[in-house]
Amino acid sequence: MKEWRRNILGRELVVQYGKVAKQSSGSALVRFGDTVVLATANISDKAVEGIDFVPLTVEFQERFYAAGKIPGGFIKREGKPSESAILSARLIDRPIRPLFPKKLRNEVQVIVTVLSVDPNVPPDVVGIFAASLALNVSKIPFEGIVAGIRVGYRDGQFIALPSEEDIEKGLMDITVAGTKDAVTMVEGEAKEVAEEDMVKALRFAHSVIKELVDFQEEILSEFNVEKIPVVEPTPPEGLVEAFKDLLNKEELERRILVKVKKEREVALKEYEEQLLNQIAEKLSVTDLEGIKPFVSELYEDAVKKTMRRLIVEKGIRADGRKPTEIRPISCEVGLFPRTHGSALFTRGETQSLGIVTLGAPMDVQIIDTLLEEGVKRFMLHYNFPPFCTGEVKPLRGPSRREIGHGHLAERALKNMLPPEEEFPYTIRVVSEILESNGSSSMATVCSGSLALMDAGVPIKKHVAGIAMGLILEEDAEIILTDIIGMEDHYGDMDFKVAGTRDGITAFQMDCKVSGVSDELLMKALMQAREARMYILDRMYETISAPRPHLSKYAPIIKVTKVDPEKVADVIGPGGRVIKKIIKDFDVKVEIDDETGLVKVVGSSEENVDKAIELIREIAKEIEVGEVLEGKVTRIEPYGLFIEVRPGKIGLLHQSKVGEDMRQFLKKVKVGDTIKVQVINIDDLGRLQFKRVTEGENTQHGKTHSKRN
């Protein structure tokens, strides 16, 4: 067993190797502060046939024992990965994926298991460090060292590993990963920060990343691991030369420049089939399937190089646009009669339908994860059905990609929402991607913002998003605005920026190259800002402010406040009072017994108002001398019990009836209404009444109460 220690950011970072998981090809047990994770890396013996990508899987296992908790719910065992675990797995996957050899076809599995969790040291950040180490000490081909860090920005200072208070009161929450040379991955949110501050944050993060990578280099200097060779199939003799001879570059250009996505795909596929047949004929090959993978690979490379060359040399993109040009945009709102808010945002061949549903406070999402407990009142769900790209696939639950895209769009919008005190609704936004050709997550931000305004949610400002790309050649650096799927696939960088007219609210970046300079990143962010302003103008032209009224189909929520000491009166013995209010007025009621905040939800405004009025009446302090009307609930020989408010019952003693009790009882029965005056409230809060007769002059405030 080997162990290494280093103090980083005022915490001890401890790495152990050879103590646990020794049968794994690579493993690392890493402790940073009180967060402990185990990362393991393994590879299959045989390559997977018929694929053209690296078959990498990253799993992030949350174990509730790491936080000293037992899983909630009926089954007390962790099941399928939670949404937070999936997001953490994606966060680890993205910086390591580009570092595998492109021709690797053996299955690789990285598993990060959280064994102990420190709220101030995110396990996914430690997971990036541990996964990098596990891969580097294994026999798996892996070409680099990566690390990650979480960064906050508060009171003009950048903070590595910010506390929850720093995040809440600060302006930024981003996770950054990279190599010793550059930042390669960013994911996070901000409260309308400037582009300059975002670049400074990445520079600050990279200074910490370099220290973490340096520690890994120190550890890895003690290892001399023999990596598995990546076996590349050899193409048949003469195939590469035949492909070069038969490829017509002008014809390939013409097909790449077909403007419509589906037509372009068909044109390129047809030309690939044509080349395959020509090569087979030239080489006298009868087994087309045998040479098809080699031809496809050569063709893919030719398409990539040609698309990039057209952009660099001629400034022309596949759909005919210039590098900074945005596709045509259209926005519509109020599409459906019964939904609470709706919007259709179309940018070129990417289309998102945003639907807003307003729910009651009790419709919140309950959160119970390793690091979080509580509720979530704003949710954004992103759906990417197969028809949006004209494909046929089985419909199952949300994919990791759908969860990740929805999370990014949610972070972009959430800081523009009104506080719960001003708008007590639970808000759900659903984005249905109806058509996709790049940047659907940013289209979701736009459709979500439009739909929120259409629903009458008082968001502070519109939020728009744009996806940017980069073509990096030895003699050129071309930044692309509003990339399509083809440019995302063949480009060197994909970064998404969402924000208002005043700053960035969400940012995501993935780099396929070794990294980009601060100057280039700043240039790209400013180009993205111009695009964002253009899109925001189109959105404000469609709907410039939240609608003044909610949909008539949205639930009505009204809020009142009562003295916390009176909450018990509103609830009543065994919940009798509140249950009666709920039943009588067909409403839902939520009461915070600490603050006395009462929320009443219903479909009828009249009923909600009546319920609120009654709750206020119940919570109102009853004073000695007050004249009230109440119903007789019980008759005893010594007097009558009268309910003057729900749950508030007092005694009208026979001596206070004002006439002979026997005669009076002949005239009264249970359920009758009697006017009484409060003459005493004892130390236990019990009420005593006297009967008020017709024409009697009662002087409010006279008392014999011990309280007064």
UniProtKB/Swiss-Prot annotation:
Q: Which UniProt keywords apply?
A: Cytoplasm, Magnesium, Metal-binding, Nucleotidyltransferase, RNA-binding, Transferase
Q: Which cofactor does it need?
A: Mg(2+)
**SUPFAM superfamilies tied to this protein:** Eukaryotic type KH-domain (KH-domain type I), Nucleic acid-binding proteins, Ribonuclease PH domain 2-like, Ribosomal protein S5 domain 2-like
**What does the UniProt entry say about where the protein is found?**
Cytoplasm
Q: Single Gene Ontology BP term? A: mRNA catabolic process
Instruction: Offer a single GO CC term for the protein.
Output: cytosol
The record, for InterPro entries, names:
ExoRNase_PH_dom1, ExoRNase_PH_dom2, ExoRNase_PH_dom2_sf, KH_dom, KH_dom_type_1, KH_dom_type_1_sf, NA-bd_OB-fold, PNPase
Q: What GO molecular function annotations does the UniProt record carry, in alphabetical order?
A: 3'-5'-RNA exonuclease activity; magnesium ion binding; polyribonucleotide nucleotidyltransferase activity; RNA binding
| EC primary class | transferase
Q: List the disulfide bonds.
A: none
Every copy of the S1 motif domain together lies at 625-692
Q: Which Pfam family, any one, appears in the UniProt record?
A: RNase_PH_C
Spell out the reaction equation it catalyses: RNA(n+1) + phosphate = RNA(n) + a ribonucleoside 5'-diphosphate
Specify the KH domain's residue ranges. 555-615
* Role noted for this protein: Involved in mRNA degradation. Catalyzes the phosphorolysis of single-stranded polyribonucleotides processively in the 3'- to 5'-direction.
State the similarity comment: Belongs to the polyribonucleotide nucleotidyltransferase family.
Q: State the name under which the record lists this protein.
A: Polyribonucleotide nucleotidyltransferase
